[in-house]
């Protein structure tokens, strides 16, 4: 009989930078337990696809919620807070790259309108700095300062991430206008299920590659399993490799069908995205509005005074 091992490999055409990132991810998985934003930065020029989908969802297959808080409107050349919330139960543990259990990390991507960018340190107030803590933000790329990423960072401490944002000034940038703009947000908790090269992580379910009977389950010395499936119709046996982490659901002698789960799905995290809107407000419009409101108030005051004066005249005429 022929023996075939069906497992995921990093193919030869993978570029050295991506290969290095994957190696780093495996080595440091115990402490950095969710996918790195740099994976998306290296693989995609823009993190938001034409369909509106943020590319982080290509590796983080489970859908989870995310929230964002931004002001309804901001003035030009001003610093404001954009708060991304990534809620999850901090009591749960996830499978790390070494197969052990550990806490979840979180990460986020904030896609701002053109012209909006991360506020420089000298423009950030002490109050905002105190709220931010020691967070380290970075631009998605040198040419995309309006896209900001962060992570992985400890989810236990940072379920709320405060981004200090500087609004643009149309007086200095002619392509910027006073209007309503969209903001796109992605937030993740936990590790991904797929690496950028398409191979599986150990944070996902593993299925049978063929239909047949399980003839042997070999527990590997460093964790994980080799599951041998006898495929009678094809006259061969196939060995499915299961890395440390997922829990085995099958036993020797059991008959399985192709694509039937051999393990549980250990993933407890997921990715979510949400949209928001913000208005870049013209200061002159605010001044005009204040002037209008002041005129309305004055008109009301004069109307009340006039009414009282008229009542006094009527009262005097009645007494006369």
Swiss-Prot record:
Keywords: Chloroplast, Electron transport, Heme, Iron, Membrane, Metal-binding, Photosynthesis, Plastid, Signal, Thylakoid, Transmembrane, Transmembrane helix, Transport. It comes from the Eukaryota. It comes from Gnetum parvifolium. Its main location: plastid. Residues 1-32 form the signal peptide. It is a single-pass membrane protein. The 4 large subunits of the cytochrome b6-f complex are cytochrome b6, subunit IV (17 kDa polypeptide, petD), cytochrome f and the Rieske protein, while the 4 small subunits are PetG, PetL, PetM and PetN. The complex functions as a dimer. One of its GO terms (cellular component) is chloroplast thylakoid membrane. It is found in: Plastid, Chloroplast thylakoid membrane. Its cofactor is heme. GO terms for biological process: photosynthesis. Disulfide bonds: none annotated. Binds 1 heme group covalently. It holds the Pfam family Apocytochr_F_C. Belongs to the cytochrome f family. The chain crosses the membrane at residues 286-306. Gene3D superfamilies: 2.40.50.100, Cytochrome f large domain (2.60.40.830), Single helix bin (1.20.5.700). This is Cytochrome f. Component of the cytochrome b6-f complex, which mediates electron transfer between photosystem II (PSII) and photosystem I (PSI), cyclic electron flow around PSI, and state transitions. The keyword Metal-binding applies. GO terms for molecular function: electron transfer activity; heme binding; iron ion binding. Heme binds at residues 36, 56, 59-60.
């Amino acid at each position: 009989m022929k023996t075939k091992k069906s497992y995921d490999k990093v193919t030869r055409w993978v570029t050295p930078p991506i290969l290095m990132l994957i190696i780093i991810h495996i080595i440091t998985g115990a402490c950095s337990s969710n996918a790195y934003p740099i994976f998306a930065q290296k693989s995609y020029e823009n993190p938001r696809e034409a369909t509106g989908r943020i590319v982080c969802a290509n590796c983080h297959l489970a859908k989870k919620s995310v929230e964002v808080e931004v002001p309804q409107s901001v003035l030009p050349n001003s610093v404001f807070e954009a708060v991304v919330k990534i809620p999850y139960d901090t009591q749960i543990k996830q499978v790390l790259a070494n197969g052990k259990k550990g806490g979840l990390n979180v990460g986020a991507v904030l896609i701002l309108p053109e012209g909006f960018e991360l506020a420089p340190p000298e423009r950030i107030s002490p109050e905002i700095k105190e709220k931010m803590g020691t967070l380290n933000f970075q631009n998605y790329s040198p040419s995309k300062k309006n896209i900001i990423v962060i992570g992985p960072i400890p989810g236990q401490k940072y379920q709320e991430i405060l981004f200090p944002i500087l609004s643009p000034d149309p007086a200095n940038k002619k392509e910027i206008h006073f209007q309503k703009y969209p903001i796109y947000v992605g937030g993740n908790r936990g590790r991904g299920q797929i690496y950028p090269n398409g191979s599986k992580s150990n944070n996902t379910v593993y299925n049978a590659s063929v239909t047949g009977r399980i003839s042997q389950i070999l527990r590997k010395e460093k964790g994980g399993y080799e599951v041998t499936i006898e495929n009678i119709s094809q006259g061969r046996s196939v060995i499915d490799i299961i890395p440390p982490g997922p829990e085995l659901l099958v036993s020797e002698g059991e008959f399985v069908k192709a694509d039937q789960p051999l393990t549980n799905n250990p993933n407890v995290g997921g990715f979510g995205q949400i949209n928001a809107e913000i208005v870049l407000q013209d200061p002159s419009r605010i001044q005009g509005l204040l002037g209008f409101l002041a005129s309305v108030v004055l008109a009301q005051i004069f109307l009340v005074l006039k009414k009282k004066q008229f009542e006094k005249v009527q009262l005097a005429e009645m007494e006369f």
